Design a protein with these regions (language model features):
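Short secondary-structure boundary/capping segments
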Residues: 116-124, 187-191, 227-231, 245-250, ...
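Conserved helicase motor "Helicase C" RecA-like lobe of SF1/SF2 P-loop NTPases
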Residues: 175-195
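Short, well-ordered loop/turn elements at secondary-structure boundaries
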Residues: 90, 96-100, 138, 165-170, ...
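Long, largely alpha-helical accessory region at the distal end of helicase-like NTP-driven motors
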Residues: 170, 179-180, 275-313
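Short linear interaction motifs
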Residues: 77-93, 192-198, 202, 206, ...
């Protein structure tokens, strides 16, 4: 079992994760151990796979990945075992595989190789991507990075000024965690949750509500016009998976993770500008976000239109 193999391969990780239950530690199981144990793992997954909401063990469609299991990554943490495939076997999705026409659309795709690696397109297909000749369908964004311009500015000073502006305009603050949300909204009265997000967005489109805080909402919300005249991105969008966190722990400058994080930042920046006649001020904050965009040259992964707006600002 994995329980027997891990302490032999990496006793320090075993101690940190299993014995000490350190939630900050994670380890990637070596591929030779994973391949040796994958059949045994599959039997366990098959045994405990169910749809019971209160007692769910497997959180993905097992038949979709069963053939790929020996080739997956396996990351072990104190709270979970995460199995990550290299990609989805789209041949098993019959409606997709047999479709006579497939249309792929993206507003912020900085790496089109994903069409080949994840969706199975032929390389020659991406040589004829349809793109607009100009960026005149994109609204106006003034992109500000206050601490990059003046190192003496503190988060508290920036917050005070933005809070003042929220008396005149609707201001949206997107933060990566509930803990950071407390910096902007200690009482929680202005923090939008999944329970009230629909009403909150609807109200912002109708009238002035001031400042609202959204936690980890970098896509899926549209705030055109006066619904959002100032958008604050405070902090770096969190990584999705334990595998991504593991990669970051051993290679903080990974170009793959950097590209994905910058794409999420750009998605967040687009929440307040929804048409070519729209306008919004975007404020970027946070030391980690600054490191990604400036020290690690993450700005180079912006789309061309956003890169131009960033440069002009």
């Amino acid at each position: 079992s994995l329980h027997d193999a891990l302490p032999i391969y990496d006793p320090h990780s075993y101690t940190n994760i299993v014995d000490c239950q350190n939630t900050q530690k994670r380890t990637l199981l070596p591929f030779w151990i994973w391949q040796e144990k994958s059949s045994e793992v599959y039997r366990l997954l098959e045994k405990y796979d169910n749809d019971e909401e209160q007692n769910q063990f497997v959180y993905f469609n097992l038949p979709l990945f069963s053939d790929q299991l020996p080739l997956c990554h396996c990351v072990i943490t104190a709270s979970c075992i995460e199995i990550t495939p290299f990609g989805t076997d789209i041949s098993k999705i019959k409606s997709f595989q047999s479709g006579s026409r497939r249309i792929f659309m993206s507003a912020t795709l900085s790496d089109d190789s994903v069409f080949v690696t994840a969706l199975g397109l032929k390389p020659e297909s991406i040589s004829s991507i349809i793109t607009p000749e100009s960026a005149n369908d994109i609204g106006d964004r003034l992109i500000l990075f206050p601490k990059h311009l003046n190192h003496n500015l503190t988060d508290e000073i920036i917050r005070e000024k933005i809070t003042q502006l929220a008396g005149q305009y609707n201001v949206v603050v997107i933060v990566p965690s509930g803990e950071r949300a407390k910096f902007w909204d200690p009482t929680g009265s202005r923090t939008v949750t999944k329970e009230n997000i629909k009403n909150a967005v609807s109200t912002m489109k109708e009238r002035l509500v001031g400042l609202r805080v959204f936690v980890n909402r970098y896509d899926g919300i549209d705030l055109p016009g006066d619904a959002c005249r100032m958008l604050v991105l405070d902090g770096l969008p969190p990584l999705h998976t334990e595998y991504e966190k593991y990669v970051q722990s051993i290679d903080a400058s990974s170009s793959i993770l950097l590209r994905e994080q910058v794409q999420r930042i750009e998605q967040g920046m687009g929440r307040g500008v929804r048409s070519n006649s729209d306008s919004c001020c975007v404020v970027l904050m946070g030391d980690q976000l600054s490191d990604v965009l400036l020290r690690n040259q993450g700005v180079s992964y912006f789309s061309k239109a956003t890169m131009v707006q960033f440069g002009l600002s």
